[in-house]
From Swiss-Prot:
InterPro entries: Huwentoxin-1 (IPR011696). It comes from the Eukaryota. This is U3-theraphotoxin-Hhn1g. Expressed by the venom gland. It comes from Cyriopagopus hainanus. The presence of a 'disulfide through disulfide knot' structurally defines this protein as a knottin. Belongs to the neurotoxin 10 (Hwtx-1) family. 51 (Hntx-8) subfamily. Hntx-8 sub-subfamily.
Length: 87
């Protein structure tokens, strides 16, 4: 009888310990996505888009000239790929 009480106590203590470990792990995991997203979307000066002298694909070409390989569409006023009928 004593042996059964001891095994039940150890089982219960093990379950409580497992609950505490899982709770601590889950609380850390809740903070992890927030930290990850803030580091991904953090604005870094090295990765800011540089101003170009020319406009790239589907950029407005009113004031800027299109980069090489693109032409300014008279219809949409955007830089597009040249097509045979646009030449």
């Amino acid at each position: 009888m004593v042996n059964m009480k001891a095994s039940m106590f150890l089982t219960f203590a093990g379950l409580v310990l497992l609950f505490v470990v899982c709770f601590a792990s889950e609380s850390e995991e809740k903070e992890f996505p927030k930290e990850m997203l803030s580091s991904i979307f953090a604005v870094d000066n090295d990765f800011k888009q540089e101003e170009r002298d020319c406009a790239g694909y589907m950029r407005e070409c009113k004031e800027k000239l299109c980069c090489s390989g693109y032409v300014c569409s008279s219809r949409w006023k955007r830089c597009v790929l040249p097509a045979p009928w646009r030449r």
